[in-house]
């Protein structure tokens, strides 16, 4: 299955992911746009569909997100809106656009939303991020019921502390002590769960939020 990789500004990192997929024997292409800009999304997908008249997106992974951490009484309007625009509104814009073609085909489809432990339990200093991810979880459950009759499944994955660019500035040694397994998770571990939810084996699973956090629930 060819992979379409969206990115906003980091072309070098996106190209590295593309190369990794191709080195493993897969096919991939880049599709740059700002997930918070509905006009940019429509233009990019219109162009992609024009270039691929016989193809359609069967699996959508909503993974766009940013952090602008701050305690609420010091949080600026831009810190609040930037996080919700990318993390929550981006999910809405992209999913709405692709559902227009995913649903009428009646071939089924997979939507996997990357939520977060922050959206499950809330994290201090992340009221904006926690709100966006909690809303994403609610939207996952609602949308799953809306599209189930078209054989489209919608699920969410809620990672805890994972070794990514978004957690690079966090004190990993200290935070690992909070995790019963004693370590951060890896992107490969999250990817394996996403791959399962996107597979035929998960065709009867929908509306679920699956935590992957090393036992960190409270």
Q: What is each PLM-predicted segment?
A:
Residues 57, 71-72, 79-84, 167, ...:
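Substrate-binding pocket helix/loop in short-chain dehydrogenase/reductase
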Residues 73, 121-127, 149-150, 182, ...:
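Active-site loop immediately N-terminal to the catalytic Tyr-X3-Lys motif
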Residues 100, 145-149, 203:
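Alpha-helical segment proximal to the catalytic Tyr-Lys
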Residues 186-212, 216-217:
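C-terminal substrate-recognition "lid" of short-chain dehydrogenase/reductases
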């Amino acid at each position: 299955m060819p992979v379409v990789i969206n990115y906003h500004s980091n072309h070098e990192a996106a190209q590295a992911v593309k190369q990794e997929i191709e080195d493993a024997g897969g096919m991939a292409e880049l599709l740059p746009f700002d997930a918070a800009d509905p006009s940019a999304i429509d233009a990019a997908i219109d162009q992609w569909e024009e270039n691929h008249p016989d193809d359609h997106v069967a699996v959508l992974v909503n993974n766009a997100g940013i952090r602008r951490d701050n305690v609420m009484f010091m949080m600026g309007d831009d810190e609040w809106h930037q996080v919700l625009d990318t993390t929550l509104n981006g999910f809405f814009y992209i999913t709405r656009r692709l559902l227009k073609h995913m649903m009428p085909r009646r071939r089924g489809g997979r939507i996997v939303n990357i939520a977060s432990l922050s959206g499950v339990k809330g994290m201090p200093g992340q009221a904006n991020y926690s709100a966006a991810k909690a809303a994403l979880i609610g939207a996952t459950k609602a949308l799953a019921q809306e599209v189930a009759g078209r054989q489209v499944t919608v699920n969410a994955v809620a990672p805890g502390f994972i070794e990514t660019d978004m957690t690079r500035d966090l004190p990993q040694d200290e935070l690992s002590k909070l995790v019963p397994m004693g370590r951060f998770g890896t992107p490969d571990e999250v990817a394996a769960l996403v791959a399962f939810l996107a597979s035929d084996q998960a065709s009867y699973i929908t509306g679920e939020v699956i935590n992957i956090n090393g036992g960190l629930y409270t």
